[in-house]
Swiss-Prot record:
Enzyme class, spelled out: oxidoreductase
Record-linked PROSITE patterns: TAT
UniProt keyword Signal, yes or no: yes
Subunit note: The mature enzyme is a heterohexamer composed of 2 alpha chains, 2 beta chains and 2 gamma chains (alpha2beta2gamma2).
Keyword Flavoprotein: yes
Keywords for the protein's UniProt record, in alphabetical order: FAD, Flavoprotein, Nucleotide-binding, Oxidoreductase, Secreted, Signal, Zymogen
Enzyme Commission code: 1.4.3.11
GO cellular component: extracellular region
pH dependence text: Optimum pH is 6.5 for recombinant LGOX expressed in E.coli or in P.pastoris.
Reaction(s) the record says it catalyses: L-glutamate + O2 + H2O = H2O2 + 2-oxoglutarate + NH4(+)
Protein name: L-glutamate oxidase precursor
Xref: InterPro entries: Amino_oxidase, FAD/NAD-bd_sf, Flavin_monoamine_oxidase, TAT_signal
Protein's job: Catalyzes the oxidative deamination of L-glutamate to 2-ketoglutarate along with the production of ammonia and hydrogen peroxide.
Length: 664
């Protein structure tokens, strides 16, 4: 799951997307600025006739706060289910259960139901891998993957890469399975582990450290043509100033200057008012009509705070993502890659998983929906019938049918659109399947034989002189060879991974620049640019036994991602390296091993997109129908929660669906 949207928290915290803007800007800006000369929005009024009816808005608020219909928190109960299993007393006999999809939601639901004594079969379209959008490029694993990088010890994330400490259900699974976690540095740190904010902002031909921009933003801001009132205010502070009045509906600023949630009843009502007021607004409309920001200032915020690609999409979607995680929340990564979590889940249900079984048809029994197209199910059972087909990659194409009493459908709605279901689902569900908006996200990862982002200038001198005694000065003066001969030239780069064709393509795409910026000298964190790469991230930790590392050279969403999706995989790597060089300088080329990996979630035949990223109005128009069972069909997956793209949303939905089946 691609972590995941779009805005830096108004109080300096991080949404799923704001790590892409890298909180260094917001964090430093918060300490250095106290306000902004901007048109501040009015409080989110509850009686706006343009909004959705208040009951629907309350339903959305309950979903995002994870409350039941009596406004009681559900998370403690869900945690107890993960710890102790489903309730011991069942109302009916054990059921035959089909789980469609072996992502986190499907695996958790299958594990819980199996522990409770139900007979479970999991159907997964992928021929060899479970985990859905939790995917690690690695050697081996349960999928027995081939070595992805020149160094067999290296691995990198194609999807989910960090886990908030405030996601209790995922943290419960990590602790229960005894997986090793460590801090994920979304803000770069120095060698002592202190926030450094030394990574780069590279926009409009200007390159500046994040900390320097937070202290003196005028040069960058003026390059966007923003009004004089915004010359000396960092982008994060401008954004914070227009979002804070909305957050006042459900939280307040404490004496220590930090946001504190209001009591639950007030919080619920406040969120409902926000949904009613802005539920059918896009982020662009909010920033222009409500916040009164001009186009140039929105360009500044969009570029530095990763809002550009999300401006046409739902304000509520972005605002929820920015508000459910405290600014003090630590983030973690899993040693060995995030895929160790689905590894652990798969171990518990492996014998029940059928890989290479793509579901093409579903029939289900519903007494109120008679249909002449339903031939395989009946009132006395089976209640669910599923037709599948294999992809035939390792043998002949085969069809296989499965029956059950109930099913858990975790397929993304973008993929469920291609599954024939009889009788037809309810109108609300069919509308959600047809209309729920999924976005694109693409990563391009490049392997280097040395962790050059951790170098100081003395390190650069030493390493470049190992290639040629005069090479350090040649790069500094723009005299280094530009014909591709220096690609992977360092002695640490394994031979045999860079072809003559790669050198030619690289030389044709090589960044043309004579200046060489100073060493980054950081651990973790990342940089932002207005070039095609947009956001770049360094590993937070070295891989034991390896002197190199894999850089997330480009992480992009929406239209930015589509620019990469048009390129073949191999064609992306020289472009991504060029974008890195525009930010970090040409000399990084000597450590490039020639190995890269890329993931387009929109082009993925199992994911059908990054995640559900809702359009204006879809929270109130579609959300209520998405998680509701249709007879014996139950629905789970992060798209059925108000935490799309987060593993927490998938686990939350899995526990809900398992309880529905077990207690029916």
């Amino acid at each position: 799951m691609t972590e995941d949207h779009a805005v830096v928290r108004s109080d300096g915290g991080l949404s799923r997307r704001s790590f892409a803007a890298v909180a260094g800007t917001a964090t430093v800006a918060t300490a250095l600025t106290s306000g902004v000369a901007a048109a501040l929005p009015a409080p989110a009024a509850s009686g706006d006739s343009r909004g959705a009816d208040f009951d629907r808005c309350l339903a959305v608020a309950r979903a995002l706060l994870v409350l039941d219909s009596d406004d009681r928190p559900l998370v403690p109960r869900y945690q107890s289910v993960l710890q102790k299993g489903l309730p011991a007393q069942r109302r009916t006999r054990p059921k035959n259960v089909l789980v469609i999809g072996a992502g986190p939601a499907g695996l958790v639901a299958a594990w819980l139901l199996k522990r409770a004594g139900h007979r479970v079969t999991v159907l997964e379209a992928n021929g060899n891998r479970a985990g859905g959008r939790v995917k690690t490029f690695r050697s081996g694993g349960h999928e027995r993957a081939e070595q992805p990088f020149a160094d067999p010890r290296q691995y990198a994330e194609a999807g989910a890469m960090r886990i908030p400490g405030s996601h209790p259900l995922v943290m419960e699974l990590i602790d229960q399975f005894e997986l090793k976690k460590r801090r994920f540095h979304y803000v770069d740190v120095d060698s002592e582990g202190r926030p450094a904010n030394r990574t780069w902002i590279h926009v409009n031909g200007i390159r500046v450290r994040r900390a320097d921009y937070a202290r003196a933003p005028r040069r960058v801001n003026r390059s966007f043509g923003v009004p004089r009132a915004h010359w000396d205010t960092p982008a994060a502070a401008i954004l914070r100033s227009v979002l804070d009045p909305v957050r006042d509906e459900f939280s307040r600023v404490g004496r220590d200057g930090k946001r504190v949630d209001k009591p639950l009843p007030e919080r619920l009502q406040g969120w409902a008012r926000v949904v009613q007021r802005f539920g059918d607004w896009s982020m662009f409309r909010f920033l222009t009509e409500h916040a009164g920001l001009d186009e140039r200032t929105i360009d500044l915020i969009g570029t530095l705070e990763n809002l550009t690609s999300r401006l046409p999409l739902s304000f509520i979607h972005s605002f929820i993502g920015s508000s459910l995680i405290s600014p003090d929340t630590p983030f973690y990564e899993l040693e060995g890659g995030t895929a160790v979590l689905p590894d652990a889940l798969l171990e518990r249900v492996r014998k029940d998983v059928r890989f290479d079984r793509r579901v093409t048809r579903i029939q289900y029994h519903h007494p109120d929906r008679p249909s002449p197209d339903v031939e395989q199910v009946r009132s006395k059972g089976p209640h669910v019938w599923v037709d599948t087909v294999s992809e035939g990659r390792d043998g002949p194409v085969v069809r296989e049918q499965f029956t059950a009493d109930v099913a858990v459908v975790t397929v993304p709605f973008s993929g469920l659109r291609h599954v024939q279901i009889a009788p037809p689902l309810s109108y609300g569900k069919r509308r959600a399947v047809c209309e729920l908006h999924y976005d694109s996200a693409t990563k391009v990862l490049l392997e280097f034989s040395r962790r050059w982002w951790e170098f100081d200038e003395a390190d650069w001198k030493r390493e470049l002189r190992a290639v040629d005694p005069g090479l350090y000065d040649a790069y500094r003066t723009g005299r280094a060879a530009a014909d591709g001969s220096l690609l992977g030239a360092h002695p640490s780069v394994p031979a045999g991974h860079i072809t003559a064709g790669q050198r030619t393509h690289y030389a044709a795409n090589r960044a043309v620049a004579r200046d060489q910026p100073e060493a980054v000298d950081v651990v973790g964190g990342g940089s932002v640019s207005d070039n095609a790469n947009r956001f770049m991230f360094h590993p937070s930790h070295p891989v034991p036994g390896s002197a190199g590392g894999v850089v997330l050279a480009s992480y992009s969403w929406a239209d930015d991602a589509l620019r990469w999706d048009s390129l073949d995989d191999e064609a992306r790597y020289p472009h991504a390296l060029c974008g890195l060089q525009q930010v970090y300088g040409q000399r990084i080329e000597v450590f490039y091993t020639g190995a890269g990996r890329t993931q387009s979630w929109l082009r993925d035949p199992y994911a059908y997109g990054e995640a559900s990223v809702l359009l204006p109005g879809q929270h109130t128009e579609l959300l209520s129908a998405i998680p509701v069972a249709e007879g014996p069909l139950h629905f789970a997956g992060d798209h059925t929660s108000v935490k799309p793209a987060w593993i927490e949303g998938a686990v939350e939905s899995a526990v809900r669906a398992a309880l529905e089946i077990h207690t029916a």
